[in-house]
From Swiss-Prot:
It comes from Streptococcus equi subsp. zooepidemicus (strain MGCS10565). It catalyses: [protein]-peptidylproline (omega=180) = [protein]-peptidylproline (omega=0). Residues 163-248 form the PPIase FKBP-type domain. GO terms for cellular component: cytoplasm. This is Trigger factor. Its EC number is 5.2.1.8. It is an enzyme of class 5 (isomerase).
Amino acid sequence: MSTSFENKATNRGVITFTISQDKIKPALDQAFNKIKKDLNAPGFRKGHMPRPVFNQRFGEEVLYEEALNIVLPAAYEGAVAELELDVVAQPKIDVVSMEKGQEWTLTAEVVTKPEVKLGDYKDLTVEVEASKEVTDEEVDAKVERERNNLAELVVKEEAAVEGDTVVIDFVGSVDGVEFDGGKGDNFSLELGSGQFIPGFEEQLVGAKAGDTVEVNVTFPENYQAEDLAGKAAKFVTTVHEVKAKEVPELDDELAKDIDEEVETLDELKAKYRKELEASKEAAYDDALEGAAIELAVENAEIVELPEEMVHDEVHRSVNEFMASMQRQGISPDMYFQLTGTSQEDLHKQHEAEADKRVKTNLVIEAIAKAEGFEASDDEIEKEINDLAAEYSMPVEQVRSLLSADMLKHDIVMKKAVEVITSSAKAK
């Protein structure tokens, strides 16, 4: 196979490559065996037409397209490897010549990975907004959250105040006409929770059990039900019960109810302080790492980032997002209806982050190359075992899912990130 590359513009060019007859002939045989199963011809059983008869009747050229589909992937990848090109995005393939008995000649318009001119990426000094310090107020707030989780709702006779829960029936109408979804029975609503549209909950403050309250509200302009958006509505609301939140005493017994491993409130607070310190330390390290990587990317120059790279990353990101929505039972149509957005809007929302990720990956890859990082067999094996432990999967299953090249790439990328972050300091 002969190959050549002609540079057309920055990060763009055309590969010309040939496919030899020793590759074409087996591909033609495979193509014939694939289509002959459906062939009918006088004097032959279905699927048993001899090759010479086929060639005479239809011509060998009929097989060329199928044969090309068979032989092209390996031929193209071989040409890219021989030319040592770092290609991104899908190529545009054109046939130059496909003559019988001759080698085939093709071209591939390709986009290549851009050059990265690295700036400073070691000993960086960065702004880090996160703090490692844990205050008494943060510890007390965590205890208070757990205390509130153990609160009980107790029926009271007094008027409802914000934070109380009311059990209500309601019937909604617009211009005197009831609408779908505007009716509820024995609904528990915490006042101040923001569960209902703005203005609804506030009008139930002061109500008592047995009261009927006429709640007047206006649906937001961006309300998901377009036929109700911006319209004034009336909800006739009957209050059946008012319940107050009763929290337990803040003492050692509460501490033991929250965590059976402690005996006193002081022990619980000490445990929470240690947990918060570990959490804030991790958050600080993440913030330092993120800021250092961001500065290393800013310090580098990427020579004409191909739009195809960002476009592909946007598609990958959107597909991943929609897959996560579908796992939650939300179809694409349902998502766009609920959010009032379109496929185009979603792509635009992902563009900035996609652009940032592509640039970041390019710079980290360039650092790994500049540092001469490689991945040893032992490091690959450790990575497989670590992933198996992290995701509770058999080692062999992880090995079958991830190629050696993917694992090597991940390992050298981690090494490059470590080079950036290990010497970075906060201002």
